């Protein structure tokens, strides 16, 4: 039973169910998905007992942002200090975690955290991501001042990951509220964002990639590093707009002072061959329109009178 529930097919199904359930109940001025990242200075605040979680880690895959974590049990002094720290940001993503199922206990929302959310909505552009029961919105003041509100229904790792992707347009918004939140949102509320504008992150099985092949990539990278071919690298594989492999190996330099991270940002120079010329040549070769045994000047006649006239396409 355990193996069946945790098989690749079962996980893919669960991911699809979660993805289709995520509900954007409010989106003032169309802030979500975030478009002009160059105009946004984003902070991500997790009201959580954890120092860092998958939600924030996934957000960081899309842009540079500052992460803050504070437990719901923190006192007003700490929450107010955090509000002061957030003044320099023009967009604040607040994710609410570790909720419970008890209405009598306000679904685990502490008075301090509720006060914090209200005060923050008065001062900042707030995007709220509620990882729990939508009825909890009844206890949250200031929703009318928030830019966007996403209801995610539970706090699982998959839900956290996909919620972050939705905010940046990695996946569309399709869900609708199954219940009404008194005086705030009616049953069936749910803004539809049918188009994805950025890469989606998922598991290899979603694109039918074979894990044993991906393990070979790991081995090649690690072997190259051990042989001194390069100090480190990041390898990312995408199919149909879905990232199914994204790993970092080794260090940036041979002195091993800084590890390579999947969150590192690189200069995008010298990628034309990889992302343009090579795929185009592969397509033409597959259509029998390019003979790689011929000379380049057979296709680019202006090279015929240069010192490049003997270069073979291959």
Predicted regions, residues:
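A short, well-structured edge-of-sheet supersecondary motif
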Residues: 225-259, 292
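Preference for extracellular/luminal or secreted protein segments
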Residues: 1-206, 210
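Short amphipathic alpha-helical face segments that pack within enzyme cores
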Residues: 162, 274-280
